[in-house]
A protein has these predicted regions:
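Conserved N-terminal alpha-helix of the aminotransferase class I/II PLP-enzyme fold
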Residues: 48-97, 122-129
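Glycine-rich beta-alpha junction loops
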Residues: 25-27, 40-47, 195, 217, ...
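Conserved small-domain helix->loop->beta segment predominantly found in fold-type I
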Residues: 279-340, 344-349, 360-370
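PLP-dependent enzyme catalytic core of the Aspartate aminotransferase-like
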Residues: 1-4, 87, 128, 137-139, ...
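Short, solvent-exposed beta-strand edge segments and adjacent coil->beta transition regions
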Residues: 60, 225-227, 314-318, 373-377
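Short, well-ordered beta-strand elements within core beta-sheets of diverse protein domains
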Residues: 260-269, 316-325, 377-381
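Conserved PLP-enzyme active-site core in the AAT-like
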Residues: 2-11, 17-26, 88-288, 295
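N-terminal "arm"/small-domain region of PLP-dependent enzymes with the aminotransferase-like
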Residues: 2-70, 78, 376
């Protein structure tokens, strides 16, 4: 490669202020790198008025406005869709905004929505808000209902949510049974697939219409980006979500897209590392006398394990522990706060381990929670497994005697 870059062409002298705004900067051709360029834009420049006036919002072959798409965001959308096994993806500012995109695209006043009782709590709060203020009926169902879903369907049911597994209590639903019933009746199904990151569960192979993910988690991997995605294999569903996204004004920054793109090449390696450590630590905790139950999809006694074994090719870094009922909430809180290598905080999917206690009985409305002990969800990060196990053991010994 030559070091002789082409010189800027000579032209009429212009004021420096104008030159700063309208530079002529030839670039040496042939540059390539592993990174997708970061294209920041609000205004998108059109070559002529005819091109501007010919815009069709349904077309993905035309650039419109930086809020809607840039080369950087499109590159990320394409990669997310490919990993998931879909054809179309839309990026949202957060996982919750991706959930909102589905609601706004497919539900209106007078419609009925079914949501699993183990759903991600912001989705529950979103549904309750829509029910209270927008005239939509939202009902919660037992996540293990399977083909029993048929008895719950109404003529105005428009949307069924699924979560596989439940991100706190780890039940794995019979996804194909539910999606088959929905498809027979023209009901849209949307599944929160954040747990699998599109790696170990392929929703479109099991009849799901729309997959929703929080790219905040495994895709980013750094605990420093907020982003979500809606993915589908159906063009009409894609256009409905695209239209709703544009009307609400949802968009993502090119810089955030670049950060997520940077995390994708290592995602599967990280995912498997989380999985190995989580399985080992969950198995060890299962043998501890302080523990009444370990909720991990790979364990035979986890609700829906047979469906996980049939439909999944792995597990992530999440699992939950139900402590023996003899321990009070205060004691379990002290155990969690006594952990040195586990942070307290929302979200997961990054390099650092996290532990959070939950009052599941207070969160359920569709049925009775079968356990009496306090539940703690563990997210196993990339710290060495032996150090994490030693940290848990120290806090167990100190606080749960």
């Amino acid at each position: 490669m030559t070091d002789d870059f082409p010189a800027a062409p000579a032209g009429a002298a212009r004021d420096p202020q104008t030159e700063l705004l309208h530079p002529v900067t030839p670039v040496q051709p042939g540059f390539e790198s592993f990174s997708v360029p970061t294209a920041r834009a609000s205004t998108v420049i059109f070559p002529d008025l005819a091109s501007m006036r010919a815009l069709d919002w349904r077309s993905d072959a035309q650039w419109r406005y930086g809020l809607h798409a840039t080369p950087t965001s499109v590159a990320l959308q394409q990669r997310i869709a490919a990993i998931e096994g879909g054809r179309y993806a839309l990026l949202q500012p957060s996982g919750l905004s991706a959930i909102s995109n589905v609601y706004f695209a497919f539900v209106k006043a007078g419609d009925d929505v079914l949501v699993p009782d183990n759903v991600y709590s912001p989705n529950r709060e979103h549904g309750d808000w829509l029910a209270q203020d927008f005239g939509i009926t939202v009902r919660y169902y037992d996540p293990m209902v399977g083909s029993g879903m048929a008895a719950l369907l109404r003529p105005n049911t428009r949307l069924i949510w699924l979560e596989a597994p439940g991100s706190i209590t780890m039940e794995v639903p019979d996804v194909p049974a539910i999606t088959a019933l929905a498809r027979e009746r023209g009901i849209v199904t949307a599944l929160d697939n954040t747990y699998s990151a599109g790696l170990v569960f392929k929703p479109f192979e099991h009849g799901v219409d729309i997959s929703v993910q929080a790219l905040t988690k495994y895709q980013s991997g750094g605990s420093d980006v907020l982003m979500g995605a809606t993915i589908t294999a159906d063009h009409d569903l894609y256009l409905a979500m695209k239209r709703a996204r544009m009307r609400v004004g949802l968009g993502v920054s090119a810089d955030d897209c670049s950060l997520v793109l940077r995390g994708l090449p290592s995602m599967q390696v990280r995912y498997r590392a989380h999985e190995r450590s989580a399985l080992a630590i969950a198995g060890w905790l299962k043998r501890r006398p302080e523990v009444a139950a370990v909720l991990h999809p790979a364990f035979e006694d986890c609700p829906g394990h047979a469906y996980w074994k049939r439909d999944f090719t792995g597990a992530g870094g999440l699992f939950s522990v139900v402590f023996d009922p003899r321990y009070t909430s205060a004691q379990v809180d002290a155990f969690v706060e006594g952990l040195e290598l586990f942070a307290l905080g929302w979200s997961w999917g990054g390099a650092h381990s996290i532990a959070m206690p939950y009052d599941i009985a207070a969160m359920r409305t569709a049925g009775m929670w079968p356990h009496r002990g306090v539940l703690v969800r563990f997210y196993i990060g990339l710290e060495h497994e032996a150090d994490l196990r030693a940290d848990i053991e120290r806090s167990l010994t100190r606080h749960l005697r």
